[in-house]
């Protein structure tokens, strides 16, 4: 179910939340924030009008590495909604070799069921923990049989006072971790999953075969000798699975998939027809993919193993760099289904400085935390941040512009020696300044051939 704390967030609040993770691109954030708020608005309408209001799908246009995918992913996380990301190039027209576009909705349904199953397990976790404790205590303290007609369930409900006192004592020790290293023998459910390789375009058949073999092996268990520390999470997971009503999970998940699902289609420009003259034979398949996508975006029924999913109210966000093609190269019917168009700007040096320092999980904070696990106190001076941003911008300008992803490459190269030597430098403090950056990267930046292959 959508997070009640975020379901009523205003567009301004949604943008502010996205700002904590993504730098710049205000227009794109506004567009997705309005789209998310419109879902809440639609749910407040009378049912007959609610079904007539269709989502306004979004087309994001911008170079790689500027935040298109991250905006969509953060939006789905914020809304606690089923989300799936696909590349348009992985799909081909029905009849060609490749994946069927309806697999997108099947993947979304899988994601939704998994999300709702995990949420259901969280709700019953306390009860599952108690049941797991009882099973561990039963293994530690076998109940005494009482001859013919002995009922173990009745014995569990009405234990003797001596048994009760012992179990209370052992339960306390169990919760305090005093019994973690003790070994016990348990009947643990067997996971009957089987990995089946299928040729392109037959993924649905592979899923059905996996499900069939899983059902054949369900209910089986095997005796295993484990430490209590290792057995406890297995038992909690098993007991939580027993407490969850799978039918309720599937019903709620399919409804969430239909009403709140978000599909992000990347590289949509790669299936656009590029120009009139000199077009390749691949254009036939490209247009076929667009025509196959059209029913999903317009609204259709897709059969999944959980039931039929209606795509009428699923939000589709498509993105592409559109270097060689233009949005107008998409077939007119598909263009009309993406009424909101947002252009994301290329990142500048100033943007890189902000990306390195401002987000909640900024890159510099990540590297500082990683090396702190080795006892190395790493800090970045402001002039180092400025120099790193300048180098990333220069390399992007000279080579292929890969946006913020260039920062990962530059930082990995910068900290290569330190990451290797970190275990031997426990307790040391290291400050990275502009001089250190130039010492590590200066030669690479100045030599265009080296920077092409290393940065």
Swiss-Prot record:
Subunit structure: A double ring-shaped homohexamer of HslV is capped on each side by a ring-shaped HslU homohexamer. The assembly of the HslU/HslV complex is dependent on binding of ATP.
Matches recorded under NCBIfam families: hslU, PRK05201.1
Protein name in UniProt: ATP-dependent protease ATPase subunit HslU
A Pfam family hit: AAA
One Gene Ontology MF term: ATP binding
Entry keywords, A to Z: ATP-binding, Chaperone, Cytoplasm, Nucleotide-binding
Gene3D superfamilies given in the database record: 1.10.8.60, P-loop containing nucleotide triphosphate hydrolases
Any one GO BP annotation for this protein: protein unfolding
Cytoplasm listed as a keyword: yes
One annotated Gene Ontology cellular component of this protein: HslUV protease complex
Ligand binding (ATP): 23, 65-70, 266, 333, 405
InterPro entries according to UniProt: AAA+_ATPase, ATP-dep_Clp_protease_ClpX, ATPase_AAA_core, Clp_ATPase_C, HslU, P-loop_NTPase
Subcellular location(s) of the protein: Cytoplasm
Record bears the keyword Chaperone: yes
Coiled-coil ranges from the UniProt annotation: none
SUPFAM superfamilies: P-loop containing nucleoside triphosphate hydrolases (SSF52540)
